[in-house]
Amino acid sequence: LEKIHSLTAQGLVSDKSRVLFVNDGSRDKTWELIQGFAAQDEHYIGISQSRNRGHQNAVLAGLMEALHSGTCDVTISIDCDGQDDINAMDEMVKKYLDGAEVVYGVRSRRDTDTFFKRFTAEGFYHVMNALGADIVFNHADYRLISTRVLESFADYKEVNIFLRGMVPLVGFAHDVVTYERHERLAGESHYPLSKMLALAFDGITSLSNKPIRIITGAVSYTHLRAHET
């Protein structure tokens, strides 16, 4: 909330801006905390999903809620673990005012990650790009999106949600803001290797036809070899 007040004081955003929390079906007291914030200050609002539908669907739910509210010009998505620098929002909004419809938050380095996390994460980006997915290196889901982009994005009916690759497909002018990633405020990452692999699979199958070509080629080769024998 302090960040909204700061942006408002600089004349970058309206005082009507809001902080929207998305509760992804958590079983702890997260939703109670969100309701408490909303009861204390009108700048806080929240939505709660009936069950855990995954990080990407939670982000999408927040974006669509913001779009359908009909009151915002831009939406900035950010995780609540404290690792993404909220001060990067100032530059994001400035770049939007300069004409960018999408502004990607990009980590300048990954010093706070373990070697294994850094190795697998960077490998993920390289593999996705090699398979033809147009994603921004070291960008996760910290980004500014204009309502104009969200309106076009809402037309996508993907089953496997992979926002890092889907947003660039919409087009529109874009820019990048780099920032240093912080340590987590609490808890542990909910993106172990298994979830990263699942995310990679969703991204590959929804954004690239290269796996289909590879599989088709393998099937054709097997079929030919079977006939030869």
Labelled PLM ranges:
Residues 2-15:
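Short, acidic, metal-binding catalytic loop of nucleotide-sugar glycosyltransferases
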Residues 13-25, 48:
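Short beta-strand/loop segment that forms part of the nucleotide-sugar
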Residues 23-31, 82-83:
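A conserved acidic beta->alpha catalytic loop
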Residues 45-66, 74, 83-166, 182-201:
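Acceptor/aglycone-binding surface of glycosyltransferases and processive sugar-polymer synthases
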Residues 175-181:
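Catalytic beta-strand/loop signature of glycosyltransferases that borders the donor
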Residues 204, 209-221:
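Alpha-helical segments in transporter systems
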Residues 222-229:
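Conserved small/polar residues in nucleotide/adenosyl-binding loops
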